[in-house]
A protein has these predicted regions:
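FAD-site-proximal beta/loop scaffold in flavoenzymes
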Residues: 16, 33, 218-238, 242-244, ...
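Flanking helices and flexible, charged tails adjoining ferredoxin-like Fe-S electron-transfer domains
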Residues: 53-112, 122, 129, 155
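Glycine-rich dinucleotide-binding loop and its adjacent helix/turn
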Residues: 75-102, 209-274, 398-414
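N-terminal Rossmann-like FAD-binding beta1-loop-alpha1 element of flavoenzymes
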Residues: 109-133, 257-266
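Dinucleotide-binding/catalytic capping subdomain of oxidoreductase cores
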Residues: 135-138, 145, 151-152, 160-163, ...
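C-terminal, flexible cofactor-proximal segment of oxidoreductases
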Residues: 408-477
């Protein structure tokens, strides 16, 4: 019997570290790691030791004999992956290496981490592993740690939601203090933190929706608001009565757009009158040949009680494609039969339609696209992606991320590094990648801090004792 990694794999790579057979691929050192949706266990090498099951923080690994009918897809994907992988690389050694520690110093290193989401958690954990005397203060504007992991991940992704428990050990360490309900940039400035700490790490994520059309148009909603409301509704056994019906239009083509469609299909998001939405259209800028969502997100949507249509504009399905999404498209086209089941929610995916205008007409919303199409709906959900909120004293690039080179914050004017200021997570690389991607991202940023720290601490301007560094208490406060 072998084990299979499912689609909600977080790519934390903890499983790779504990596997005695080195049979989990790709590793973080391999080029495919950045592009695969999830990791794979070689069915010809797995010895059923279950070490990976215990190590997986997302609960995404199961014995193949325990897979449900819909999960068998991942066993097939695993076989396909290793069939295409060169034999020489299937069982090669895994080179993880030991992280470089902070050099010894005459006083503890003081760091501020801005934000308390997944990127911050992995950063704090990485920092604690590099020094026994380090002192870390985490500043968070909300009342709880966890960020979008706590508020926006669907209840159907319970394995991912359970990753909140990873905060427990690092954030309760005696070397870590948390300061909740503090807005950096408003309650305390970046400049003040730079004066008080040796290093400031920006981990505030990207939770601001990218703008489309006219702001505050009646019937417009942000995806993050709806998903958070849906989670609250599930927690309280109710429904999120937010939309105008009967038709909803979701603008955006990533996993978040499909998450909103799934929440509507599950009737967690309904009309203000409590009625289910009767029709959903997802309007994506990406092409049907290169959609932005993952195969797992699409597969999850197809498992719901919906009637899914892929609007292809006459283009035939790519039957021979190696891309898993295109394969699923082809399977859906082959299996599709005319339906008269009015109980199923009609969901149509439109591709190649970038929004050019959006306005209110007669109480409804009209949307026009680059493909010369016009869509009309009662509610529109903006799921076009996220950007970081600007913070005074932090340089931002045009794409909405903090100006940086591999975690070192740089001046956009000169390109020079700003000593003592670093960034991690979505604020560093943009709003893409899952929870576990932050682990490698955090390690890269901390590597830069370790490399720079002696130069930073030799700066006489940073030699004063920090008010934040005195009387340092552990735990959440």
């Amino acid at each position: 019997m072998t084990h299979v990694i499912l689609g909600h794999c977080c790519k934390d790579a903890s499983c790779i570290q504990v596997c005695p057979q080195n049979c989990i691929r790709p590793t973080p050192a391999e080029p495919e790691f950045d592009t695969v949706e999830h990791l794979y266990i070689d069915p010809g090498a797995c010895i059923d030791c279950s070490a990976c099951v215990q190590a997986c923080p997302a609960g995404a690994i199961r014995p193949d004999s325990a897979l449900s009918g819909s999960e068998r897809l991942y066993a097939r994907r695993t076989r396909d992956f290793f069939a295409d992988l060169p034999t020489a690389r299937q069982r090669g050694p895994v080179r993880l290496g030991l992280p470089r520690a902070f050099p010894q110093a005459d006083r503890p290193l003081r760091l501020a981490v801005v934000g308390a989401g997944a990127a911050a958690m992995y950063t704090v954990r990485e920092l604690l592993q590099r020094s026994s005397s380090i002192r870390i203060t985490v500043f968070e504007q909300q009342a709880e740690v966890g960020g979008l992991l706590r508020t926006a991940v669907s209840w159907n992704h319970q394995g991912i939601r359970d990753m909140v428990r990873l905060f427990d050990i690092p954030f309760s360490d005696d070397r870590v203090e948390t300061r909740m309900n503090v807005r950096v940039g408003a309650d305390v400035s970046i400049a003040a933190l730079q004066r008080e700490f040796d290093v400031v790490v920006l981990a505030f994520g990207a939770s601001r929706s990218r703008a489309i059309g006219v702001p505050r148009i009646p019937g417009m909603h942000q995806a993050i608001t709806l998903l958070s409301a849906a989670n609250d509704a599930v927690r309280h056994g109710t429904q999120a009565r937010l939309l105008r019906g009967p038709k909803a239009l979701i603008v955006g083509g990533g996993n978040v757009a499909l998450d909103v469609a799934a929440a509507i299909a599950r009737r967690r998001i309904v009309t203000r009158a409590g009625e289910p939405i009767a029709q959903v259209a997802v309007v994506a800028r990406s092409s049907v040949r290169r959609p932005s969502f993952t195969m797992s997100a699409l597969h999850e949507l197809t498992e719901l009680d919906i009637d899914l249509t892929i609007a292809r504009d006459g283009a035939p399905p790519d039957v021979g494609s190696a891309d898993p999404v295109q394969r699923l498209f082809a399977e859906l086209a082959e299996d599709r039969r005319p339906t008269v089941d009015t109980r199923k929610l009609p969901v149509t995916l439109w591709f190649g339609n970038e929004v050019t205008s959006l306005h209110s007409v007669g109480g409804r919303i009209r949307l026009e696209t680059t493909a010369k199409r016009t869509f009309t709906a009662d509610s529109v959900v903006n799921a076009t992606g996220f950007a970081s909120t600007a913070v005074a004293g932090v340089p931002f690039a045009e794409d909405g991320v903090v100006s940086n080179r591999r975690g070192r914050v740089v001046s956009p004017d000169t390109g020079a590094s700003i000593d003592g200021l670093y960034v991690v997570g979505w604020a560093k690389r943009g709003a893409h990648g899952g929870v576990g991607d932050n682990r490698r991202c955090a390690a890269e940023t901390v590597d830069r801090i370790v490399a720079d720290i002696e130069r930073i601490r030799s700066d006489p301007r940073r030699a004063a004792t920090s008010a934040y560094g005195r009387g340092h208490a552990g735990g959440q406060g």
